[in-house]
Amino acid sequence: FGHGGLLAISILYFVLFIIVGNFFWKKDKKTPGGLLYVCAVSVIPLLVWAFECLVGIMPKELDTYNDFHIFIRQGWIMMELATISVGCIFLKYRKFPLLTLPICYSGWYLSMDIVPLCLGQAIEPTWGMRNFATVVFALLMLGYALKLDNKKQGTEDYSHWLYIFGATMLWGVIISILAQFELDNEFAYFLTAIINLAYMFISILLKRKIFMVW
């Protein structure tokens, strides 16, 4: 199809997801409608990537969309910012908590892609930089989830999904750090047990079962 074809298909999917999503939403079928809105926001990275490739903005080494989920590159930043922006617009007009999924996911990617730019280095981040960015982003997400939890109004529970994403990212980076240090098995198991106990304590303190999963 080429980049022009992918752009046209992405726009078509985006519009169809919105139209059908609106149909269900207005019929008071919030779940299918909301899921289609999530799909619409999830199309944004591909749409922006195809557009940037078509007009020649995207670097040639980023000419494969699948690399977006594999490699950390500064060239993805516009895709991530666009996804976050569109997701926030949807979230403002359609109160569906799962819309935080593409927003958080893109925010996580952005937190890693932007690190070299903040340091003034247009290079691929090291594992240490990636882990640091993930830890900071996960803690910020958990902190914001706690803030929303304390100010919870209505039936929508946005903090629930933020807790899930934040706890998952934090657990993943902890495992990554332990693997890098190549710690002795018994010591690594001990640290893992301590972290699990901390998660259990937080779960009891916040009355959130999600932390018990880990």
Segments from the language model and where they lie:
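Alpha-helical multi-pass membrane segments and their bilayer interfacial helix-loop junctions
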Residues: 1-214
